[in-house]
């Protein structure tokens, strides 16, 4: 699948999606951008004990997240849930 065939969000956008786990990281299926998924950046940097608690809290839920980085050539989208929670 070619990423540039689909529209991607911009850094700073707030988007909504459903959280799921893949390869010990949390990803979000984006409702507004079909065929796109984003990775929760903070889930990659966490210690395993904290990650398990975070995973149990979020997997399967629909959440709003803030886009922190987008690689338009590769189609990678990094989002942050914690930054979104601070602004609410």
From Swiss-Prot:
Residues 43-53, 74-79 are annotated as: Binding to host EIF2AK2/PKR. Pfam families: S1. Residues 8-82 form the S1 motif domain. The keyword RNA-binding applies. InterPro entries: K3-like_poxvir, NA-bd_OB-fold, S1_domain. One of its GO terms (molecular function) is protein serine/threonine kinase inhibitor activity. SMART domains: S1. It comes from the Viruses. One of its GO terms (biological process) is symbiont-mediated suppression of host innate immune response. The record marks 45 as: Involved in host species specificity. Keywords: Host-virus interaction, Inhibition of host innate immune response by virus, Inhibition of host interferon signaling pathway by virus, Inhibition of host PKR by virus, Interferon antiviral system evasion, RNA-binding, Viral immunoevasion. The C-terminus is involved in the inhibition of host EIF2AK2/PKR kinase. Interacts with host EIF2AK2/PKR kinase. Viral mimic of eIF-2-alpha that acts as a pseudosubstrate for EIF2AK2/PKR kinase. Inhibits therefore eIF-2-alpha phosphorylation by host EIF2AK2/PKR kinase and prevents protein synthesis shutoff. Determinant of host species specificity. Belongs to the orthopoxvirus OPG041 family. This is Protein K3. The gene is OPG041.
């Amino acid at each position: 699948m070619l990423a540039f065939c689909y529209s991607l969000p911009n850094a700073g956008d707030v988007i909504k999606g459903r959280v799921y786990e893949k390869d010990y990281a949390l990803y979000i299926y984006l409702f507004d951008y079909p065929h796109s998924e984003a990775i929760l950046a903070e889930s990659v940097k966490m210690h395993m004990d904290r990650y398990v608690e975070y995973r149990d809290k979020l997997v399967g839920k629909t959440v709003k997240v803030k886009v922190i980085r987008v690689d338009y050539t590769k189609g990678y989208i990094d989002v942050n849930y914690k930054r979104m929670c601070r602004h609410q």
